[in-house]
């Protein structure tokens, strides 16, 4: 083997780890960029507005007890994201503003709508998959037993309050749509709201249906 070839071979083995690192780094950079682009698509900086208002959902939930205001506030204070003046008003006074979802309020809305979904009386909770798969122990799911911001035990509020009045057609629309929306965290449809994201999304669908949203 010639000296030149030896040098090339030696150089290959010496540089191979660094080359591999460089290739891996480029792949990781590309993957991160792709993830960032996807995140921007599903959670844009400008946010997006849905055709529904908060109205008196907040006061209703505080009145029912599914939200203990002190516990709710403390949760956000502990995470260094204290509730804003507007968020406190949504909870205590209600709001006629349309609901805008953005990066700044997504954590607030997750818990807000989790409570709505848990407390709102609906066929999904009374007769749906969560009852079927719960086998008499519906309170064992993360979306039910995992709710810790209520006055008493979470199942005391399960499907107990008519927070979002819906006519039969609107409830049927929710049941039609929720079975086709799957969550990447657990690969279950919203028709089976066994986690907090599923319960929150169920509430959003119910609120939109009550505001005459269509399937499209």
Descriptions of predicted regions:
Residues 1-10:
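Hydrophobic membrane-insertion alpha-helices, especially the h-region
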Residues 10-11, 52:
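Intrinsically disordered, low-complexity segments enriched in small/polar residues
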Residues 15-35:
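Ser/Thr/Pro/Gly-rich low-complexity linker/stalk segments immediately outside membranes or between
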Residues 37-199, 214-215:
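Acidic/His-rich structured neighborhood in mature extracellular/periplasmic domains
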Residues 202-210:
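Short glycine/serine- and small hydrophobic-enriched flexible loop segments
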């Amino acid at each position: 083997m010639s000296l030149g070839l030896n040098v090339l071979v030696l150089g290959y083995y010496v540089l191979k780890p660094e080359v591999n690192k460089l290739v891996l780094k480029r792949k990781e950079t590309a993957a991160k960029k792709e993830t960032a682009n996807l995140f921007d698509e599903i959670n844009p900086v400008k946010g997006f507005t849905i055709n529904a208002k908060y109205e008196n959902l907040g006061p209703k939930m505080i009145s029912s007890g599914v939200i203990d205001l002190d516990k709710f506030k403390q949760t956000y204070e502990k995470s260094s994201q204290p509730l804003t003046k507007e968020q406190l008003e949504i909870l205590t006074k209600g709001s006629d503003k349309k609901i805008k979802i953005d990066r700044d309020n997504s954590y607030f809305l997750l818990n807000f709508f989790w409570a709505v979904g848990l407390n709102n009386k609906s066929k999904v909770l009374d007769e749906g998959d969560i009852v079927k798969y719960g086998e008499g122990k519906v309170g064992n799911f993360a979306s039910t037993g995992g709710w810790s911001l209520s006055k008493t035990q979470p199942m005391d509020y399960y499907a107990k309050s008519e927070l979002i009045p819906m006519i039969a057609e609107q409830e049927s629309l929710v049941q039609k749509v929720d079975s086709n929306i799957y969550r990447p965290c657990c690969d279950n449809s919203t028709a089976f709201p066994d986690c907090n994201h599923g319960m929150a999304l169920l509430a959003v669908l119910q609120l939109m249906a009550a505001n005459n949203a269509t399937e499209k």
